[in-house]
Amino acid sequence: MGLVHALLPFAAAAALLLLAAPPPATADDPGLAVYWGRHKEEGSLREACDTGRYTTVIITFYNAFGHGRYSLDISGHPLAAVGADIKHCQSRGITVLLSIGGQGGAYSLPTNASAADVADNLWNAYLGGHRAGVARPFGDDAAVDGIDFFIDQGGADHYDDLARRLDGYNKYYRGRVGVLLTATTRCSYPDHRLEKALATGVFARIHVRMFGDEQCTMSPRYSWEKWAAAFPGSKVYIGLVASPEQDSAWMFQKDLYYEMLQFVRSLPNYGGLAIYDRYFDKKANYTGEG
């Protein structure tokens, strides 16, 4: 049973609007984000966007950086096809982000200069920049809408420098945000790896992972509300696993509504749900209506 379908007896039309807001989303719509790129069997990026479920897809992961080497790992998906799919998703009003970091990989920012180099590579390889000698893995005419910081290992140094530099590229866009910055944090507040970066105030969204942390399993609503209170200027999302196969913190749809959504959805900076990940959402139909 899908997430929307399961909530209808309890929240009727309100839950439908909350969890199944179809793209394109306005600034005031609750969002439904999904992480894509961890399993080749999850289907293409285009397929995910064509479900009509998601307002944002987050490509995972740009997972090697900071030492003069840059690498993308999207589990064997063909890069050329992803570029075409990015443009297709954007044509449907769906935001496409590239997540940096993740579990595993080889990344850190040992110096301010390394942060500058990573910002330059992200800008010219994946965002709106172009520079001779810098390859664009998704093609010359495909650009993601922003960068998600999913920093799950190493130290905290210089991610604030990276965030400021990426935000600085918005000067090249007139009247709009060309480089959207988001962060995927651990549930316990604060997340020490991202604390300094978030203090810059340049992150439009924060996706709080309500899994992988015993404290959050015990008191998920309280843990999430600490984040919402700390960052009133950012949209704060509830990060969920789509299947009990992934983590014991998986929340049955009814429990999600009664334990969290009925209380937090009225908060002005509630952003929506962030589902990890597309493979398990497709397999379990967690956000579907069937």
Swiss-Prot record:
* Sugar-modified residues: 112, 285
CDD domains, per database record: GH18_hevamine_XipI_class_III
Cysteine pairs bridged by disulfides in the record: 49-89, 187-216
Q: State the UniProt keywords alphabetically.
A: Disulfide bond, Glycoprotein, Plant defense, Secreted, Signal
Q: Which GO terms describe its cellular component?
A: extracellular region
Which Pfam families does the record associate with it? Answer: Glyco_hydro_18 (PF00704)
Indicate the segments forming the GH18 domain, all copies. 30-290
- Tell me what induces its expression: Induced by wounding and methyl jasmonate in roots.
Q: Which InterPro entries match?
A: Cts1-like, Glyco_hydro18_cat, Glycoside_hydrolase_SF, Glycosyl_Hydrlase18_Chitinase
Question: Biological process GO terms, please?
Answer: carbohydrate metabolic process; defense response to fungus
Q: Which domain of life is it from?
A: Eukaryota
Molecular-function GO term, any one: enzyme inhibitor activity
Q: Where in the cell is it found?
A: Secreted
Family stated for the protein in its record? Belongs to the glycosyl hydrolase 18 family. Xylanase inhibitor subfamily.
Assembly with partners or alone: Binds to fungal GH10 xylanases.
Q: Identify this protein by name.
A: Xylanase inhibitor protein 2
